Regions:
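Conserved beta-hairpin
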Residues: 44-81
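Hydrophobic membrane-targeting signal helices
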Residues: 24-25, 48, 163
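Alpha-helical transmembrane segments
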Residues: 41-44, 110
Length: 168
């Protein structure tokens, strides 16, 4: 059975809301000659944000597959797949923000970043343990989920402030 793990909704909505908060005013404050261009670029940017946040992971009884969106691939992110039997360990590396990122290490010593911003992450980790026998009990999302919610809230407050300023 193939299971699909999409990018976290809270990640998507935080990026979209931040983009909107930062760019909604631009078409309104640009000079007349650039209004149409700024609207076109605004829509293009929104399309890019939606597309970039559509990467996902698929698991099956045989392998794990990471699929990048078209735009992600355009910017150099690659699709990959690993057979469960080829994963020999998962290594942890600290980030500058105090959390950890994890890499699947294969029998050929290839490294693949373990996706940490996906929905049903705990279920994903259970599948990893089930298929590889590796202990992933202590693994967590790369950032606490409340940070995405806070970013979304602050972005929405910015948008409301912009609307109030525009309407008054």
């Amino acid at each position: 059975m193939i299971e699909k793990f999409n990018t976290l909704f809270s990640v998507k909505i935080s990026l979209v809301s931040l983009y909107l908060a930062l760019t909604i005013p631009l078409p309104f404050i640009s000079n007349e000659r650039l209004k149409i261009l700024s609207i076109v670029l605004f829509v293009l940017g929104l399309f890019l944000i939606f597309n970039i946040t559509n990467d996902y992971v698929e698991t099956s009884s045989q392998k794990i597959t990471y699929k990048s969106s078209f735009i992600s691939k355009t910017f150099g992110k690659k699709n990959w797949e690993i057979f469960w039997k080829d994963i020999k360990l998962i290594k942890s590396l600290p980030t500058s923000q105090g959390s950890n990122v994890y890499y699947f290490v294969t029998n050929k010593n290839d490294n693949y970043l373990l996706p940490q911003r996906i929905e049903n992450f705990k279920k994903f980790l259970l599948l990893i343990t089930e298929k590889t026998g590796l202990n992933v009990e202590s693994f967590s999302h790369i950032s606490p989920l409340w940070t995405y919610r806070l970013l979304t809230l602050l972005s929405l407050l910015m948008i409301m402030g912009e609307l109030i300023a525009f309407l008054t």
